[in-house]
Swiss-Prot record:
Component of the NOP7 complex, which is required for maturation of the 25S and 5.8S ribosomal RNAs and formation of the 60S ribosome. InterPro entries: G-protein_beta_WD-40_rep, NLE, WD40/YVTN_repeat-like_dom_sf, WD40_repeat_CS, WD40_repeat_dom_sf, WD40_rpt, WDR12/Ytm1. Residues 257-285 are annotated as: Disordered. HAMAP family: WDR12 (MF_03029). This is Ribosome biogenesis protein ytm1. It comes from Aspergillus fumigatus (strain ATCC MYA-4609 / CBS 101355 / FGSC A1100 / Af293) (Neosartorya fumigata). Residues 259-273 have a biased composition (Low complexity).
Amino acid sequence: MNDGSNSDATATSSAAQRQVRVQLTSKQEDIALPDNTGPILVPTSLRRYALSTLVNKLLGNDKPIPFEFLINGTFLRTSIDEYLTANGISAETTLEIEYVRALIPPLHIASFQHDDWVSSTDVLSATSPAATWASATISQGQEKILSGSYDGLLRVWNMSSQIVATSPAAADGGHTASIKAAKFVTPNQIASAGLDRTVRLWKYAESDEGFSGTIAPQLELYGHKSGINSLAVHALSNRILSASSDNSVGFWSTKKSDAPAAPDDLLPSAASRSSKRRKLNSSVTVPQRGPLALLSSHTAPVSAAIFDAKDSTVGYSASWDHSMRTWDLVTSALVDTRTTSHSLLSLEHLPELNLLAAGTSARHITLIDPRASATTISAMTLRGHTNAVVSLARDPHSTYGLISGSHDGTCRIWDIRATKTDKDGAVGESVYSISRKSLEEQGRSDTKRVGGEGVKVFSVCWDKTVGIVSAGEDKRIQINRGEGVLSA
């Protein structure tokens, strides 16, 4: 007489042996299977590791590559069978599975200590925009890191954490207040801006051996009536965008000959006459110019202004007034306004996806489709930070990658394919969180502080050669690197 145990075993065996057809694809040519690779019948019990082994076998790799797998834009974190059950998908269908190189944790490489908070950072490397625009060759090991600090000084560092050059103090033509933004325009030119309301251009020169250099004042740009929060540069068109607390976006030329005269009432000489203060930069004469245009429409401080990554005649701005605005930089006309539910503090363009990422005061990142045809304001929300998101940079390795810097003391890496749907629509979660090394060195095991106290991140830059460079309240530049953190 059968006691039922055999039928139970048969059911278990049947579940284990259930199969599904999968079509394995990759968008990366160097790891893609041949076009004629058809659907493959695999057990639904397979998980990531077994699938990774299968793909390596199909590719004939001598040295296995760890892979991650995406189904309908979501990373596979269970068995295929569990995924099918959770999503109500029949095993009779052919499952499209995209594989990408597995994520590699971005390891700490170095930290550069400053005397004051570090507000901004940028990179000069063979793959950075400044070098690419200038068709310049930056040899391996000759990369430079630019930092702007609350002490009002710019510093250029080499990869051995040595200071190569420092900008002059206020009395010698430098900033007269804290710097909030700094960018390499070309390998020989730097732009900066800050609380002294000016945008400044500098000539950067290195000695032949590259161990020392100079940052010399080149041009002072006046037009804003309050502090400047961020800068964007586009060397090919010799243009700069600035975002100011006076509610306006500044549009400037990097060339003295193209720029109009500076407004008399905003020049230091006018301030000296009205307040009888000592003229701080009297020892140096630097050309002074005004803006090509001041774009006024925002009703609160502008936190960020950027160029469209594919069309430099288009600009975008984000503001404390909750809005993201699109500008025609040829005519200075406002083209479009997208209003969100929160103050916007940072902005980055993801051109291949037709999306703008905006960091908010509400601790999340909103992905906005700026195209006029878009029917919804927010295409996706990225959640995970515990304080304001004040800096964003796209992943140079991947169409889908983004990094954010937050006042919670962390940088988070996002793959916007890793999403789920809830009552608020599509929601993404970060794939990595980078803490401040300074906390580890203080012996704090949790490497976190409530609200990011003392370790707020103010700026983050992601360079294909150097890695992830972040700056913050801990008075440090921090470099982290993980080869191919995400996949294209």
